[in-house]
Amino acid sequence: MTGLRTVLVYLAALLPIHLGIHVYMTGILLTFIMPVLLTRKVSHFQINLPHLIERISLLVIITFGEMIMGLADFFTLEHFSIHSILYFIIMINLFMNYFGQFDHAIDEKGENKGIFLIYSHYPIFIGLIMITVSMSFLVNPEAHHLFATSFFYAGIGLFQSAVLSNGRFNKSYLRYNKFFYGFQAGIFLVGLILSLLFSAYPTVVISIATLMTLAMEIHFTHFYMAQTKKFSTPNWELF
């Protein structure tokens, strides 16, 4: 797939723009849908899931790195404020949520071809980018605060829903039930509604988002620790 995309992209670069653009888009679209087609036609399709998770996680780390670069301006002497600290806490909450799911909860030995894992990371990447962009807009007095708040929460929603959607591939005792999904959705909806109501006050919006993401992470951590203690042997020196 990578080879096909490379060939078509280089071929597109050699052609006139009115032809090259079609070849380029064909290459992108073909390699986007090929994993689905291949796994449907090849019943013995196998994948090294731990290796795949490791590689995708590296891309997520890079995306979080871009978020850190976006936050760097908030930690200068001229711009440092309570927003800087709250944004950093939000980023940590999202980071812990992601790696709690994909580094600890997911079953790396289960029957998972990895296709859903791959495609579900597109909204994760898009969500993180949307959050990064929104951070500067929320504190910009010239920005439309209702739109900035909506865009910010759309990013969080994309990220969180994509992460939680992989819960069906977790270890058997760590698969989320309806109550877990409902509680996570409830936390998000409360945060969204309150933030939209106070969208004219950036500090309030950022504070609500901080508490919301923290509540989501605490809920996941409590679920993970309780289930692990009950059905598995914890390997935590702290306990």
Describe each model-derived feature in a short phrase.
Residues 205-209:
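N-terminal signal-anchor/initial transmembrane insertion module
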Residues 1-22, 29-196, 210-239:
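Predominantly late transmembrane helices and immediately cytosolic-facing juxtamembrane segments
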